[in-house]
Regions:
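Histidine- and/or cysteine-centered catalytic micro-motif in compact active-site loops
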Residues: 32-34, 43-44
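C-terminal binding/interaction regions
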Residues: 2-17, 68-131
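Short beta-strand scaffold segments in enzyme catalytic cores
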Residues: 24-33
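Short, well-ordered amphipathic alpha-helical segments that serve as non-catalytic structural scaffolds
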Residues: 10-13, 55-62
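Short Gly/Pro-enriched turn/cap motifs at secondary-structure boundaries
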Residues: 19-22
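Alpha-helix C-terminal capping segments
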Residues: 32, 62-68, 96
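Compact, glycine-rich, soluble single-domain proteins
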Residues: 43-57
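Hydrophobic "anchor" residues
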Residues: 37-38
Length: 131
């Protein structure tokens, strides 16, 4: 439990690093790999919108670049009550999350909700469908 609260605290701390001059909506994501490594990401907006990088894909891409593929926690926090991943991020998470990966949507260390990728993206298309 302390480990989870520390991850939530970290996400809240880095949220202001987001580059969001157009929406003014700051999102942060902290992921913990099964090996215990922690990676961070924030949303980075772009004037043409489509190249905007969401916090979730930012954090996961950094971890993947460092050779990590298995995740214990994906913690997301934003400027609203509870900030859920967009559809693109849910599909991106689907590629690397398994049924044991906890996806935490947090307002603060006391107010958060825990999900699996199957909760957030039921009936999804995944790499298993291509086997």
């Amino acid at each position: 439990m302390k480990e989870l609260k520390d991850l939530i605290k970290k996400a809240i701390e880095i949220k202001d690093r987001a580059y969001a001059p157009y929406s003014n909506f700051h999102v942060a994501c902290v992921v913990m790999t099964r090996s215990g490594k922690i990676f961070e990401g924030v949303n980075i907006e772009n004037a043409s919108y489509s190249p905007t990088l969401c916090a979730e894909r930012n954090a996961l891409s950094t971890a993947i670049t460092e050779g990590e593929r298995e995740f214990s926690y994906i913690v997301i926090t934003g400027d609203s009550e509870y900030t859920y991943p967009c559809g693109v991020c849910r599909q991106f998470i689907r590629e690397f999350a398994d049924s044991d990966t906890k996806i935490i949507i947090a307002k603060d260390t006391e107010n958060y909700k825990a999900y699996t990728i199957d909760d957030l993206l039921p009936y999804s298309f995944s790499k298993k469908d291509l086997e």
